[in-house]
Amino acid sequence: MFKVKCLRGHTLRLVALASVSVFALPAFAQVAQNPPATTVGPVKPMYGNLRAFYGDLTPYYGNIRGFYGNLRPFYGNIRPFYGNIRAFWGDANPFAADLVPFWGKLRAFDNGLSAPTVGDYWTKAGGDWDGVEASWTVAQTAGASGDYSQAAAQLRSLVVSAETFWGSAVQAKTGQSFQAGFAAPLLAKYGLDLNDPTSLSKLSQSDRSMFFLEWYDGLMNFTGTDHVDHWMKTVNWTPQLTQTQGYGADTVIGLLDFTVAGDTVIQKNIVKYGGVSNFTNGHGAAVASLMVGAHDGQGVMGIAPKASVIAYNPFDASGTAGWADISKGIVMLTQNRASVINMSLGVPGSTLDQGWNAVFSDPAVSAAAKNAVFVVAAGNDGVTQTANINWNFATNPSLIVVGSIDLAGNISNFSNTPGTACLLDNSTCKPGDRLMDRFIVAPGELMLVSDDKGGVTRMSGTSFAAPLVSGAIALLQDRWPWLANYPKETTDIILKSAKDLGAPGVDPVYGVGLLDVTASQSPLDFNKLKWYQVDDKGKPKEQALKDVIKTVGGLPTTLTEASVSTVVSTSMSEQQLKFDAKGMYFYAFEPLGGTTRDFAIPLSSKLIGQNVITANGGQEQFQSYLLSRMNVWVAAQAAAGGKTKFAAANGFVEDAPVPNSWGMSMTVSIAPRPAHYGFRQDGPDYQSRLKIAGEKVVSQFGFGDGAVALANVRGLNSASDYDSDRGGANPLLGLASGGTFANFAYAMNDKLQISAGTTQRDVRRDRSDLPGLNFIDTGAERYQASAQHFGADYAVRPGVNVVGSYTRLHERSALLGTQSLDAKDFRQGTTTDGLTLGVGADLGHRTTLGISGTVARTRQIGGGQAIRIEDGLTSTAFEMALTKVGFIGKNDVARLTFSQPLFVNSGVLGTSTVQVIDRSTGAIGVVNNRIEVGQSRPLAGELLYGRQIFQRTSDLSLFGRVEVNPGAVVTQTFMAGGRIRIGF
């Protein structure tokens, strides 16, 4: 704490806020060896050098001795840190087998250690340390008579276990053994001699805690990756988020702090430096490391590692500073384009001192600082602000005050708090002007930071909570650069996205709550997002939300600008789309005071396939699909005799032909109507068919699965074969199947038969599964399709037929079964023309083989669609099915299929979207995009088995399916099940 002479002749104490060094880990010196090698030099001298650093900070120890004493609750409250490290890292889970969700593009664990084994090691080491600590405590509690032999033995075991796991990594990095390169220097630092159990008596409980933390941090230096620290999960931050948002590369941060003297990595980010001296104590580097620490495989990771830093040191050679130096620093930083200023300094005894008003009211300061956000540490006296602050709102900039929480999420015992103090506007406390309304908290205890000597250390204080907020702002202003000109809106984003802590709402202890970095980079309220349609003249078309909500029969009559929540909240966990929409986006906009910010949302999030699995029923829908396949299978297999009757293979149960005077047979068939999940089951529960057969002419009329009747390929006579998502036989017929159908066949001679037919599907979606469809008239609430089919069937020899056909599919507001929650995307629909070649063969021994392959080309109907087919889409599908009756027993049936469901091989889609066209200003306009589509080929294999049991009164069926889709999030799935039906 420094006494200085400040403005107006008053004595002011201005300090960097309680940068308490808990311990420091060394930088590994590089030395030349023969043969040349990069190794790690001696550790002990670096520890010795740090003794002076401890000495310099002695005045602060008295303030936080209680904090050290309270470290035991730290271990107790986050026991997962040691007991189960995966729980400590939480959702980020950097030690899982799949590192991408946390690390993103960073290369982690490239030194031979695997991520899962590192996690397993710390799981065991945590439990071992608990045992050491328990024995140590018992011995110390006994006083002079305490026996430390058991604790010493357990500690030796911990060291041996660490040597077994980490020895090779230490050897590779230091050129020394585990003992010489790591363990011995650290044990010596704490005065521990494992051959002398009495040496353990010298360490207090807090010293033991510090030893194990340093043991942990030291070993993690050898992982070959950046350090992961507790604060990352707490503030909901991952390196991947930083990568997505741009690393902070287009943001300039102002650092008003001590000089960064020895950290050459951080110095690379400092593009300009000023100040009254080069005085340093490591505080500036520690603060900066949390903002811009490089993601380089070692040390501290910052939230915005590529941000530029303008630095100013207001402290003179004596380590003191006054308001005049602070004012000069602010002007220098803001004049050099710093849009967020981190100030981890303040006046002891207050959360926000009145002196700040004088600084910001100065004309020179206010003119330069008006477009910057100032992030100020709250201070470390553990006081609650009681005095109001007279505040000049006309001149003073946007401000965020940051307090500290501990590792259990409670306010730090040293952190100052806002209380009920207010920023007074002409002696009046107005709504939103309380200090607590501008107060946020972030982790500030035991923070891993740069020691400014090339290594890392742990420090505590509000000084280290503030840079987390500054780093989050740097990400914001990198992703949305124009926010640098909107400091109030930027401040609002940080404060409004905070996670509530303490008493509900804004409170005198935690203010608005806990910093949430991910939430700040996300929409504050999805319900307020909007997107723009492009009108027929190619112009953005916007309409007030109140006009969009006007409805007729519960559905809007217009949709130009719409709430994106109706899209996003649908949250489908699976969408069976026939084309890859990767790289295609639409843009939603969030109103923010005088500006907006945009969000690129994958186009696929507003596209709906024909087999939808919703977020609130994903597992139930899967089970329903599985059960449905069982039911169809049992009902669809041909078997002779028995008290239970298997249906014909196409699902229809045929009655005996009805004789008539015309010489033609008439057959009426019925079958259960299969469900289309995600759609309403209107009308009768059964499908039906009337078949009229003459000498050369066969006519069929019906309601239901017309695809089987029209395709007429032997061995491919199950409706599931024509499912565009699951089967591979003529999917164009499958997309139009389910409603009325008709087919006419004429025998040209004994071998050749020609046919013509039509089928249609007209179904409404079940909006109880898709709540978004209750609010907007999208065109996707109803799927309508029809198909015309022309075929020729040639008998190559008895029992072997070759079938060729042409199919034209018309879809309204859809593309190959895919629809959109934006009515304009597929406004006038599409037409698809397909050619199919099939072979049906009776192989004898009650065995049938069916093969079908389809190639198709799709074009759009008319113009004005938001998603345009600019180059016809080419798609394919195929299936091969082998069916054996009497597989094991006389009347059982087995069926093996191999298929490639419908998918788009090639083509070009075009979109017109309204998006930001100038990222420096946020200006929006219409952008036309061309996307080449295509995806990895999906493949599927399926095995079905059914037989009658219990003297043919009951039946058993088994089902198994494997799907391989290299382009999907889940590249391989396996499904299996069985069913027993018992008859009485």
Regions found by a protein language model. Give the residues of each.
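Protease zymogen maturation seam
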Residues: 37-40, 44-48, 118, 126-127, ...
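Substrate-binding/access-modulating region of protease and related hydrolase catalytic domains
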Residues: 143, 154, 161, 165-192, ...
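Outer membrane beta-barrel translocator domains of Type V secretion systems
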Residues: 592-838, 968
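Extracellular S/T/G-rich loop segment that most often corresponds to the catalytic His/Ser-adjacent loop
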Residues: 253, 257-260, 391-474, 478
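Subtilisin-like serine protease catalytic core
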Residues: 239-253, 258-323, 336, 395-398, ...
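Outer membrane beta-barrel transmembrane domains
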Residues: 727-731, 755, 769-782, 793, ...
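C-terminal subdomain of the subtilisin-like protease fold in secreted/lumenal serine endopeptidases
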Residues: 150-157, 196, 201, 205, ...
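Hydrolase catalytic cores
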Residues: 290, 312-315, 443-510
